[in-house]
């Protein structure tokens, strides 16, 4: 089973942005962004929307839609 819920780390790299940049934009602790990027925890929906706007992508682009658990 795929365990990565979000693709934040991948999208940040594609957009040539860093964790530090994102934490500064969102005014959150760097460890929070690090946890999101490693899928240790997940941003809430309003934060996910903010991230998508900052990175100029759809929210869907930040989510791993291939998670299947049958």
Language model regions located:
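Short coil turns linking two alpha-helices in DNA-binding domains
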Residues: 18, 29-32, 44, 58
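Short, charged recognition helix plus adjacent turn
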Residues: 2, 10, 15-16, 35, ...
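Recognition helix of helix-turn-helix/homeodomain-like DNA-binding domains
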Residues: 28-42, 65-67
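The alpha-helix within a helix-turn-helix
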Residues: 12, 23, 52
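DNA major-groove recognition helix of helix-turn-helix/homeodomain DNA-binding modules
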Residues: 46-61
